[in-house]
Amino acid sequence: GDASHAVDHPIGGHPEHEHDLREEEGPLIFPMKDLPGTPGTVGGLALRMGQFIFAAASVVIMVTSDEFINFTAFCYLAAAMALQFLWSFVLATIDVYALLIKRGLPNSILLSLFVVGDWVTATLSLAAACSTAGITVLFDKDLNYCDQMHCRRYQLSATMAFFSWVLIAISSLITLLLLVSE
């Protein structure tokens, strides 16, 4: 009877009515503002810091080579990674500010700027990393120039650029998802 109902099912209703309760609650939705890596969060700051650290490493490794200035792809990588460094550093600074004032970055105009800037720098970074990697493979495998050149240094610089690109691609995707969810 009624007394056994409370003992048999102390937490919820009767099992045959549980389906009705689930329909009323609706689907579980993960709020996009809580997505790890969103701008203005510790995760977002970590992504930006990784971007500018790898970009800076790529530039430093490339420009410490004597011959890099003689090859367009290598100069392009240095320029693209310098731009990536500046962009990511500015956005990391904005993330630090948002964390200090304990507010997110909900402004859709600002998020739109982040997405477009991320896409531009990501495209430039990927193109630069690919061209540098391609030229380095050409020098190493086809022309056998690596005996006289710093091919390992060029490969390492391209690798750092790829790492930076992966992080900017993640940031841009997260920011885009946040933007379209508003």
Swiss-Prot record:
GO terms for cellular component: plasma membrane. Residues 1-20 are annotated as: Disordered. Residues 63-73, 130-159 are extracellular. Its main location: membrane. The chain crosses the membrane at residues 42-62, 74-94, 109-129, 160-180. Glycans are attached at residue 70. InterPro entries: CASP_dom, CASPL-5. Residues 1-41, 95-108, 181-182 are cytoplasmic. It is found in: Cell membrane. It is a multi-pass membrane protein. Homodimer and heterodimers. Belongs to the Casparian strip membrane proteins (CASP) family. This is CASP-like protein 5B1. It comes from Picea sitchensis.
